[in-house]
Amino acid sequence: LANTAKAFAPIDTVTVLGAARTLTVSTTAAAIGGDNKETIASIRTNAPFQYATQNRMVTPEDYTSIILRNFSTLINDICSWGGQDNPEPKFGTVFSSIDFESDVTAATQTATKLAIELVKQLAVISFNVEFADPVETFIETSLFYQINPQLTSLSINSITNSIKSVKQDYFTANTGKFKKAFRRSAMLTLIDEVSGAVLSSRAVIRMQQRIVPVVNTFNKFTLTFPAPIAKPAANASPTDADYIVKSNAFLVDGAPCRILNEQRANIATNKLQVVSSATGTIIVDNIGSFNTATGVLTITAFRPTGVLGGSSDIKIAALPANQSAIVPERNNIIKYDANASTITAVTTEADN
């Protein structure tokens, strides 16, 4: 593809009034809009859009069709839905969420959305069009597999690397677009097939979203996960695995801390706290809460003084009520966070 190309040079001079002149090339914008050769699967997906409803926009699917027909080279995926199906119903409105290709600049995205506004004249009834940004939910996996080393000539490290590759391939093939669900059983089936020495596997699944706080300022965030959140359960001696909600580390007054739901001896609630990573001391007692039924998590008066790891975001992970499947709706996209995922081999002498 020629996308992002921005350095151009003439291959020859031009003659003006008998004299050779060297051309000077100025680039006003990098090349965009190119696309890979279509696969059979993409042809099956896109072909109906080329004959979309005779240029009439009646249903949400019609909006998707017309937009894709005109801007398909800029768009990785698109989803449209009626305002009546929105979490906060808005009748007379069609919502569209566009996941642009990675090489499309913010300026081009804005210009594309403005151009799409013009297609409203194709609607047979007066509808408003509103754009909703895609909401990315990352899957974290804590995978454990049982292996009998005597049943293979390969090392455990080699088997682990193969499992890591298979797991990444599963997410690449099955997630990353609208309406693409994560199914734990499908992933574990592929892992069990990596080697005859792999006797079984299991995985703990967490949903993760990210916030970008302004340091030294009180921040407020509302996260909506694509599935209900598990209910906190009291435990006499809770461990880190018992937390329903937990974040990666950030700084508060120079000390590493995490966001955790309240979880101590025989007490477990949906209240969120800032807790010292080193000592477990509660630094801020209440910075929000989460609703287990709706999957909505609210953070208020959150004031970090720094973010670790050279990143600008903080990862907030929640344990889903049903770890078997995470099925996104509307503008939700499921992705995979390999860096927040782990693989642990458990050796056994059993052969079945």
Where do the PLM segments sit?
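Small/polar beta-strand repeat architecture
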Residues: F302-K335
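An aromatic-glycine-centered, glycine-rich loop/turn in mixed alpha/beta architecture
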Residues: F131-A132, N157-N248
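Carbohydrate-recognition loop of C-type lectin domains
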Residues: Q54-F178
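Catalytic P-loop NTP-binding/switch module of NTPases
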Residues: L1-S65, K335-N352
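Extended, beta-strand-rich, solvent-exposed assembly scaffolds of outer structural proteins
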Residues: A173, N248-K315
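Hydrophobic core positions in small helical hairpin nucleic-acid-binding modules
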Residues: A233-P256, A325-T342
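Extended, charge-rich low-complexity regions and/or helical-solenoid scaffolds
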Residues: Q84-G92, S97-D99, D133-V135, P149, ...
